[in-house]
Regions:
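Carbohydrate-interacting regions of secretory-pathway proteins
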Residues: 1-136
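Single conserved hydrophobic/aromatic residue that forms the stacking wall/gate
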Residues: 134-137, 141-144
């Protein structure tokens, strides 16, 4: 929530809160009481089950408290029809290595390097690209 301070105050203790979670493909977006909270791209768990969880209780005085959910709705068909527009999303975090999310691409971001060739590489003080003939491996030494 450090990227989204308004989300920190969205949850209301001792009251019903409305949560919206959109997990579509590698995109996970959340809202609490209409406030965008998280907008994450992550490919770690593309499939799985839905669970309602209460995290560990660290304070003995909190043991036995009641946690309740109501009016749970799950959409598995025609999902795109019910997705919230991008304009109502939290700041985006892309956790998928070496990719650009659709929103990042729309904003003009590109990968610096394709990870396979030297295309896109350039010397720090050069205006030209690097070729294979200029690459040289150096022995790695550890200093203990």
């Amino acid at each position: 929530m450090t990227l989204n301070p308004s989300a920190k105050t969205a949850f209301k203790n001792n009251a019903w809160n409305k949560a919206r979670i959109e997990a579509v493909g590698n995109s996970i977006r959340t809202w609490i009481n209409g406030v965008p909270c998280a907008n994450i791209w992550d490919d770690m768990t593309p499939v799985g089950f839905i669970a309602l969880q209460v995290h560990a209780i660290g304070n003995a005085a909190d043991e036995g408290k009641t946690v309740s959910w109501k009016d749970i709705r799950i959409c598995t068909t025609d999902v795109e029809r019910y997705q919230t527009p991008e304009a109502q999303a939290a700041p985006e975090v892309n956790l998928i290595a070496n990719t650009i999310s659709p929103n990042e691409a729309k904003e003009g971001w590109t990968l610096l390097w394709d990870g396979k060739t030297t295309d896109g590489w350039r010397g720090a003080k050069l205006s030209t690209s690097v070729s294979y003939t200029h690459l040289r491996a150096h022995e790695t030494r550890r200093h203990l």
